[in-house]
Amino acid sequence: MDGVHLGENLEDKDTEFTWEVKANDRTYHKQFKKKGFLCWRQKKYKSNAIHTAKYNIFSFLPLNLYEQFHRMSNLYFLFIIILQGIPEISTLPWFTLFAPLVCLFVIRATRDLVDDIGRHRSDKIINNRPCQILRGKSFLWKKWKNLCVGDVVCLSKDSIVPADLLLLASTEPSSLCYVETADIDGETNLKFRQALTVTHHELTSPKKMASFQGTVTCEEPNSRMHHFVGSLEWNSRKYPLDIGNLLLRGCKIRNTDTCYGLVIYAGLDTKIMKNCGKIHLKRTKLDLMMNKLVALIFLSLVIASLLLTVGFTFMVKQFKAKHYYMSPTHGRSDAMESFFIFWGFLILLSVMVPMAMFIIAEFIYLGNSIFINWDLNMYYEPLDMPAKARSTSLNDQLGQVQYIFSDKTGTLTQNIMTFKKCCINGCIYDSDDEHGTLRKRNPYAWNPFADGKLQFYNKELESLVQGRQDRAVQEFWRLLAICHTVMVQEKDNQLLYQAASPDEEALVTAARNFGYVFLSRTQDTITLVELGEERVYQVLAMMDFNSVRKRMSVLVRNPEGSICLYTKGADTVILERLRSKGVMEATTEEVLAAFAEQTLRTLCLAYKDVEEDAYKEWEPEHQEAALLLQNRAQALHQVYNKMEQNLQLLGATAIEDKLQDGVPETIKCLKKGNIKIWVLTGDKPETAVNIGFACQLLSENMIILEDKDINQVLERYWEDNVHQKAFKMMTHHNMALVINGEFLDQLLLSLRKEPRALVQNAVVDEVAQEPVVSALDFLQKRRISQMWRNAGPSLGTSHSADSKIRESPEVQRERAFVDLASKCQAVICCRVTPKQKALVVALVKKYQQVVTLAIGDGANDVNMIKTADIGVGLAGQEGMQAVQNSDYVLAQFCYLQRLLLVHGRWSYMRVCKFLRYFFYKTVASMMAQIWFSLVNGFSAQPLYEGWFLALFNLLYSTLPVLYIGLFEQDVTAEKSLKMPELYMAGQKGELFNYSIFMQAITHGTITSMINFFVTVMVSSDMSKAGSSHDYQSLGVLVAISSLLSVTLEVMLVVKYWTLLFVGAVVLSLSSYVLMTSLTQSLWMYRISPKTFPFLFADYNVLFEPCSLLLIVLNVALNVLPMLALRTIHRTVLKQRPKGEEEAPSEEVAVEPAMRHLRRGIPARRSSYAFSHREGYANLITQGTILRRQTHVDDSDGGTVCESLNPPEEDIPLQNKDSVFNPRKISILAKKRRHFFGKGSQEEVHPNTSSQTMEKQPTIHRDSETQKLPTTTSATSGKLLPSASEDEAFYSVASQYTLASQPKHTDVHSSFWKSPLWRDSASSSPSQLEVPRKQS
């Protein structure tokens, strides 16, 4: 399946540790050979040169011919040409097929050669990149292709790693090396690699590196991107190696001046190249159908030839019986005569397979590719990047795409994080400078440390900061300046932040602009400049992010000696750790929901003052847990959790992860065209889901299924396999899947032969000591069980029970998963490797039999791009590997809309019309050969002149059909984009299929019968009246009638008339007149009477009025009935009742049975991409990661993060069995918890809200004190209740009702829309309006 074998090649099989690399010893590696093709032996250690091209000078001709003859039509034509070379059976001149076939081969070979030259150029650019290689005792600049295994390489900042290297040393402390892996796994965050301590201390100069003679023994080259095991033997000692010591090819060196590495894998042996599948010849659905149709036509011609041969045999027997005296003149037996006449008929009818159609199709594909290249609407001016069709044979398939598989990083997003809003003490602060007008006047002029690039500015908030009266505001910005792992450097008297995440950098920069400047840090201190005053905080403990905690905390002692804990994290873990939950906390939670509705990435901030005695009691426990050798992570987690209780909420931040321009609109439009979009990313689930909401791939009313839920669905799928209905419930609901790479391994590998240890080894980033919790625990079991009760017995397989039994367990599992996923509106696959991306695409292709498109911009997308039917590479993002292996190149994701809905749909429609008309006109003209055989004694005598047979499809009727293939339009480009529903015709194959093919054949057969038999009958009467009636006149009359009939037919089917089309028709008919005048001239007859036998045949016929009238009669009989039928058909369609025409489908008409599963209130999504493994806090506290103050860098950074739900011990006992158990309901699939407090233990009745609606309090900022007033009931003094809309599922009442927020609280209040909550008792809305994203 296009380079991906299901399951078996998900990860490479366990390999022996037989790969030995000796430093600085090329001779050692050259002696090793491995078995190659047949008896050839090749080098075991490959060079670093890569070759993505298919051909070279010697292999081009044989390989290209081999690919050409994969087409059934070419084999057929070659076979007929061979037969034509036998004089005894040849019935047509040799040039009728030989010249067109040669022309076809030359055109296709030229196209393939041009495409491959482009690949050679791309390979040359990469292979000739420079790098420094150790030669002797110094480093010399060499090309990448000259790099060999065992070489020592020197890399500088911002350079790309040329091969898989073992990090030996770097200029950073402890030989750390920061790399960006965006071109490998799609993540723009910074990851660090570290050299062994022994190499860090010993290899300190080029001279010592030249004397380095260590030997690395490791696993054979494989595709496991996150796994590496080996050992270094040096000076009679062995040192263990893992993936943390390896720099992978394609990584970019960041924040590191210089590093040194030993080449372990080179060229095609590198992990990124192992993840790139082989180049396969992609064939369109129409191309594959054409192979079948050619075989069908050939079979039909064989049958027709057999029947005509039978007629010939019967006729010969009758003739010999009647004229027995002529028998001695026949030297051959009847059987021999029949044998020769059969092949004669086969050659005669070979013109029924139109070779010219394949030639013209090449020009059509080329022309449509040029139109894509010329489309200025897909030209990206900032990069001077037009769209480019690198493949010219897939244009029609662009109009049949049903699944799009998209990368996230760099494809959907720009990877630009912007601080957009914040909420402090329950008050929302938006930016006063949305359009950048204030930044021109430098509103932060009072702050010398301010970063002018920050787009967020709020004058009121600035006044609060400078007033120093509101502690919540001060602690808010102080927390952002302290609680992080950002590194700081100074360059040209400017502070440069090197963050592990763009999120963190945005937060710290925002604090910096508001006067709380992170200045520097040491192993146990952090220095801030707070409103011009320098303050040093002692770091007592740094509680880092991991995959379970979903939060980060820093315990510090301020200069006054007080201890304070600062915590930031996901709202689901922060809110449940608050000391109390009052109105301000409730307001903040409502604001979080509003931010989430605007697809902003939110983060909660909280703090608490810690008593000295409490710290002294906690610190020994912390030290003891930190010194454990076993279960250290679990012990630290428990200690951290003990400290992170009774917090005081400060507020929340909102960060925008910028999408590329037009992404939401593009996805919305494509979904209207019935195109399903799957996101396959190596990034974290939280990040991917946030982007899913931002780009409108996911919506708030979707039912989102994750790993555990899918397993339950699939189990029921297998149990109920006796049912014939396939996922009926899924068609009525808006559902989505969010799954991770580990789940894919478990799902698709659990029943295969590979050991499970292989799957476990593939995910080495996981913290083994952490509690095992699903990364996305979206839905609780109650929802799933209720789903099955509603679904009943309707959920089954689409295949019969018998076929299901015959399938292997792994095939059943794969089919069940694909069937489930295909019923969902969206699928997001997170943490997937490049090979897993290709596997998902291959699974859909195998079980759904649909056209797939993959789009990406990095090397991690190459395998997916190659596996899909159509590969689209985005240029200018993460290198050129995706572009080099793609079929089409775009600069922006939004251009995909025009590529598919305009160029793709047009190309498909044009090719379909072209094929239908070409088959029709071929049969309409050439079927007369069969009818002529019926009246000429089955003699295999051709009816037409040989030149007419050779030039009819190649010249006489070519230009009109070429116009259809290049310029035909049913609607304009603008209407194609406005009506994406038109695209569904291509997905269903409505414009050309076997039914339409048979219609074209039937129509052509009727046309040929009219042209031939009417001509024969009328000519008989004409001969009785004294007009000439001979064989050549009959052939000319039928030929002219056929030519005019098919020309008028194309004039009827063309919808887009231009002067160019009129010129094409005139030129085609003129070419017939000119060529016929030449081939039937006396001059050509004298040269070769055998080749030009029709002397003045057209002249003799056309100068007879009866012949002209006969031609008009034939054309009228062919055209007028079809014109009448089309007119009647269009009239009936126009008069069809509107209700009948727009009747909804069964899927749309059916009311969903599970409304309570929908999320009526938007869930919050955390702004932080939580770490998939431990963060960098331990390195900071150890001093390992800290930089020298003199070091300067200006590079960007990123992070490695992931989010998991809190462990069981973090959940309050009263909530463990509740529907609000956070382990059961994730931030993506749950309603917000309405019980807010421990403050009131009294029962709140639902009718309270209806009694007090008239006196709802107002939540606002007091202009003087800036405090949030207490909100109580006017009648009872209790907090006002509110209930959720979804009472069928959530029945816990709220403790309060939010009132309106004054207009002055948000400078963009005009953009605020309807409230998120409504009172359950009275349907009147609450008056708190929350801002939505500006349109």
UniProtKB/Swiss-Prot annotation:
Catalytic activity: ATP + H2O + phospholipidSide 1 = ADP + phosphate + phospholipidSide 2; a 1,2-diacyl-sn-glycero-3-phospho-L-serine(out) + ATP + H2O = a 1,2-diacyl-sn-glycero-3-phospho-L-serine(in) + ADP + phosphate + H(+)
Binding positions for Mg(2+) per the UniProt entry: 407, 409, 857, 861
Gene3D superfamilies: Calcium-transporting ATPase, cytoplasmic domain N (3.40.1110.10), Calcium-transporting ATPase, cytoplasmic transduction domain A (2.70.150.10), HAD superfamily/HAD-like (3.40.50.1000)
Cytoplasmic compartment spans: 1-74, 317-339, 939-946, 1017-1033, 1077-1104
Gene disruption: observed consequences: Disrupted normal fertilization by sperm; sensitivity to sperm concentration and the time required to fertilize an egg is increased; the number of spermatozoa bound to zona pellucida is decreased.
Cofactors: Mg(2+)
Tissue: Expressed in testis, specifically in spermatids within seminiferous tubules (at protein level).
Membrane-spanning ranges: 75-95, 296-316, 340-360, 918-938, 947-967, 996-1016, 1034-1054, 1056-1076, 1105-1125
Residue ranges that the UniProt entry lists as topological domain Exoplasmic loop: 96-295, 361-917, 968-995, 1055, 1126-1335
Membrane topology: Multi-pass membrane protein
PANTHER family associated with the record: PHOSPHOLIPID-TRANSPORTING ATPASE IK (PTHR24092:SF78), PROBABLE PHOSPHOLIPID-TRANSPORTING ATPASE (PTHR24092)
Family assignment from sequence similarity: Belongs to the cation transport ATPase (P-type) (TC 3.A.3) family. Type IV subfamily.
Function: P4-ATPase flippase which catalyzes the hydrolysis of ATP coupled to the transport of aminophospholipids from the outer to the inner leaflet of various membranes and ensures the maintenance of asymmetric distribution of phospholipids. Phospholipid translocation also seems to be implicated in vesicle formation and in uptake of lipid signaling molecules. May be responsible for the maintenance of asymmetric distribution of phosphatidylserine (PS) in spermatozoa membranes. Involved in acrosome reactions and binding of spermatozoa to zona pellucida.
NCBIfam families for the chain: ATPase-Plipid, ATPase_P-type
Stated name of the protein: Phospholipid-transporting ATPase IK
Naturally occurring in which organism (per UniProt): Mus musculus (Mouse)
